[in-house]
């Protein structure tokens, strides 16, 4: 079974709107991913949070707090996009490296691999769960833990 990890930047989710979500763009992404799923590909997705928050540009907020806000922005993105995917006919599950109540599942390698094997599109939100790391770092870390291929030249943000 082939597995892939996709990184969707927050800016990509915002489309022409530049902030928030562009529903038409997100539906378009869902249709493309559905083709992969229908072809038997196991899909995991990491999102950025730049459509809601760019902490590195803040001059007044502590860097740790700014990064935590960014992590939560990725959670919002994954919850939203996962629901768009459900609307498009896919099963999904959102994982985070920290407890997020009833909204997400706490990440474990076994649970993530099980969800992939069940045919679910798996979303990894919250980055590494630690400040000072980009969502790309979180994507690479989670990919390694979940036996997902990682391009050694970097992760392409779409």
Predicted segments, located by residue:
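N-terminal glycine-/serine-/threonine-rich phosphate-binding loop
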Residues: 1-43
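Short beta-strand segments
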Residues: 5-9, 44-48, 95, 124-127
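Short, active-site-adjacent cap segments at secondary-structure transitions
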Residues: 12-14, 50-55, 101-102, 131, ...
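Active-site glycine- and acidic-residue-rich loops that bind
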Residues: 21-27, 104, 129-136
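Alpha-helix C-terminal capping segments
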Residues: 37, 79-89, 141-149
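Loop/turn-to-beta-strand initiation segments
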Residues: 40-44, 119-122
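Ligand-binding beta-strand-loop-alpha-helix segment within the catalytic cores
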Residues: 58-122, 137
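Internal active-site segments that recognize and position negatively charged phosphoryl groups
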Residues: 110-158
């Amino acid at each position: 079974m082939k597995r892939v990890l996709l990184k969707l930047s927050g800016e990509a989710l915002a489309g022409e709107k530049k902030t928030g979500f562009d529903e038409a763009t997100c539906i378009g992404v869902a249709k493309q991913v559905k083709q992969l799923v229908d072809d038997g590909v196991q899909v995991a997705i990491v999102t950025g949070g730049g459509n809601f928050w760019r902490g590195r540009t803040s001059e007044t907020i502590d860097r740790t707090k700014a990064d935590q806000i960014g992590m939560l922005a990725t959670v919002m993105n994954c919850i939203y996009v996962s629901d768009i995917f459900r609307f498009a006919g896919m099963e999904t599950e959102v994982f985070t490296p920290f407890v997020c109540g009833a909204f997400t599942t706490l990440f474990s390698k076994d649970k993530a691999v099980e969800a992939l094997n069940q045919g679910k599109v798996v979303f990894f939100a919250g980055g590494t769960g630690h400040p000072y790391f980009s969502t790309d770092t979180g994507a690479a870390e989670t990919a390694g833990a979940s036996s997902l291929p990682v391009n050694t030249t970097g992760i392409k943000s779409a």
